[in-house]
Curated annotation (Swiss-Prot):
This is Probable BOI-related E3 ubiquitin-protein ligase 2. The keyword Thylakoid does not apply. Its EC number is 2.3.2.27. Residues 171-234 form a coiled coil. GO terms for molecular function: transferase activity; zinc ion binding. It catalyses: S-ubiquitinyl-[E2 ubiquitin-conjugating enzyme]-L-cysteine + [acceptor protein]-L-lysine = [E2 ubiquitin-conjugating enzyme]-L-cysteine + N(6)-ubiquitinyl-[acceptor protein]-L-lysine. It is an enzyme of class 2 (transferase). Pfam families: zf-C3HC4_3. Disruption phenotype: No visible phenotype. Decreased resistance to B.cinerea and increased cell death upon pathogen infection. Boi, brg1, brg2 and brg3 quadruple mutant shows a higher GA signaling resulting in a higher seed germination in the presence of paclobutrazol, precocious juvenile-to-adult phase transition and early flowering. A zinc finger (RING-type) spans 310-345. Gene3D superfamilies: Zinc/RING finger domain, C3HC4 (zinc finger). The gene is BRG2.
Amino acid sequence: MAVDAHHLFLSPPQLFSNRELTMNNNTMEPTSGGFCNNNQTGYGVVSPFSVPNHTSTTTTATPPLLHVYGGSDTIPTTAGYYADGATNLDCEFFPLPTRKRSRDSSRSNYHHLLLQNPRSSSCVNAATTTTTTTLFSFLGQDIDISSHMNQQQHEIDRFVSLHLYQMERVKYEIEEKRKRQARTIMEAIEQGLVKRLRVKEEERERIGKVNHALEERVKSLSIENQIWRDLAQTNEATANHLRTNLEHVLAQVKDVSRGAGLEKNMNEEDDAESCCGSSCGGGGEETVRRRVGLEREAQDKAERRRRRMCRNCGEEESCVLLLPCRHLCLCGVCGSSVHTCPICTSPKNASVHVNMSS
């Protein structure tokens, strides 16, 4: 298998036929000879071969190959190279170019020319080793590409470092903003919790005060209940005692009324005897005795009636029992206004209304 070797082309194929674009490095003007000029041409490279001028009629023409780094002295100027004339040279080595020429045809022609001139091939090899360390020529000026590349690399590094710094700064600011927002949220939550705790504490204190007041009220009510219970027991005992006294009084009244009835019967018998005796002439003493008894009975009734009347006003019958002296001595009207017992002058703590109707 045959492997094609790569050949170094110092100029692109497009520059081979563009004779009008070549310029002189000193004057920066197009040369009249095109590629046939011996001077160094512009655009950084020169065609490795030269084309003779079709209008020249002399036998001594320009050498067929001029290297970019070579001069007129590198190639011998003998007439043997142009034995057939310039027209034959153009037909043999330079076919008329088309508007679109393939890269393979250019490479084959260029390789064929290098094989015809070994000295030109050595010049090409020397040029390839020299171009790695020399400055490039572009548009007639020497430009240090490496310095520009280093400057561009420094600019890129500076932009990258600036971008990284800005990214770190933005990241730091975002983190700080996030922390501030978190602190703000925590402070708001803490304030809300503190307010709620304060409200709950105030409510608890208020409920505690209400509970304390209710407990005091319960204690006072229990004491008052105990007082009323004792008073009820006392009143019950007083009522029982008064009931017993009333029963005794009623029994005494019945006894008195029964005695009064017997005395009345006896008086009637005495009256009858007196009538009989008067007729006999001895009834004056009996009449006097009878009158004295009646007067005494009337006085007793008046005394009992007076004792039953109110000791304060004397107009109404006594129906109010005073405690703790237990004297039945006031009427219903005076029982609410008088605070001391009229009989023993002791202070009144309570009073009980007694129904005396039989």
